[in-house]
Amino acid sequence: MAKSKFLQRPTTPIRVTEKTVAELADAMALTGFQGRKLGESVMTWAEMLRQDNLTIMMGYTGAMSPAGMRKIIACMIQNRMIDCLVSTGANMFHDIFESTGGKHYVGTHCANDEALFKDGVDRIYDVFAVEQEFRGTDYMVMDWAMKNLEAGKSYSSREFFQMLGKHIVENLNADPDGIVASAYRHNVPIFVPALSDSSIGIALMVARRQGHPVNIDQMKDVDEITQIVENTKRTGVIYVGGGVPKNFIQQTEVIMSMLELPIEGHSYAIQYTTDAPHWGGLSGCTFEEAVSWGKIAAVAPKVQVFADATISLPVVSHALREKTMDYIAKRKSPQYDWSGRKLKVRFEAPKAARAKVPARAAPVARKAASAKDAASAKDAASAKNAASAKDAASAKKT
């Protein structure tokens, strides 16, 4: 009897032996269920890194930074395993918070939340943090924005985080290996299309109330990320979770068609998610469904891992590092030039980090920083309001 065409490759049980994480991932790719998908995602990502003229875009959602994943993303930026990051504002806030000396704490989801509130402790499932310390970061961002961003001027979120990253690297005693700091140092753009939905957005709103409105232009964000796709022959996408960042990247292909530009769909697609497709939401939407929209190429390798990203990312990142470090430094990744009216992109091996990182001093106590930043912002606002009142009085007198 002839062997069925469906029975060409047997599964291989994993043997417990001494092996690298990359070898474990390869072995998982020959098993079943989500273990196989995890192994396949490593293989597909590694294949992306071997391609010429390919831009790798990551969507980063969920409370990954407070859950301890921020250094993984920073490492991927530093080694150009990703070339563009689209994130929630909360993940960037928590990254900045830790980069400037704040800490998250091992907690429990069984805690008495009323008692936590009375003690000034915020809970993110089983992670704790001090609310007053968060306020210190709020005031730092607000104070920086009021002193360094032009009132009434529109900035893309990419411009905002590039400037904030420069401040963190060059002016604060901050960790140079955070996400925002690494993105600035290695010229990797960060887009946060829903920045208002975060503590950073709250800080900018308070600055507005103090008479210093800073406008984050969402349409400029859409234009800028579309320019990246326009200037790239092929793109690969990786999604940690889904949400706004996922569709913000996905829709670039739809925009290309509306601009009457060639549309091919993203050439590679990977997602790590706990959402299911049958509820109809975007976070669980399959890549096969995205093909119908022209967002993903029909022939693209597509891997969706239905698993907690706090489990997937540590395994995948270590496996990738072991599997690709021999050629990753030579990878010709996109180098961005935003100096003109239109983005220019060239593909070449990345140069050394552009920013010199100052020697780190001991982190400033968070509560002291909070009070100081609050006073600084209040003084700046008072001085500005006094000047405005004086100008108004002069105008009235004349």
Question: PLM features: what roles do these ranges have?
Answer:
Residues V42-T55, A183-Y184, Q227-R234:
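Glycine-rich phosphate/diphosphate-binding loops that line cofactor/substrate pockets in enzymes
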Residues A2-R9, R36, R234, M258-R360, ...:
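C-terminal functional extensions of proteins
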Residues M1-V42, A46-M48:
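N-terminal glycine-rich anion-binding loop in soluble enzyme alpha/beta folds
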Residues I56-S65, L85, F191-L195, P213-L282:
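Glycine-rich anion-binding loop/nest that anchors nucleotide
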Residues I73-Y139:
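A generic, well-ordered mixed alpha/beta core segment in the N-terminal half of proteins
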Residues G68-K71, I96-G102, G201-V206, I249-T252, ...:
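Short acidic, glycine/serine/threonine-rich loops at helix termini
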Residues A368-K396:
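Long, intrinsically disordered low-complexity tandem-repeat segments
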Residues A115-I200:
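Ligand-binding beta-strand-loop-alpha-helix segment within the catalytic cores
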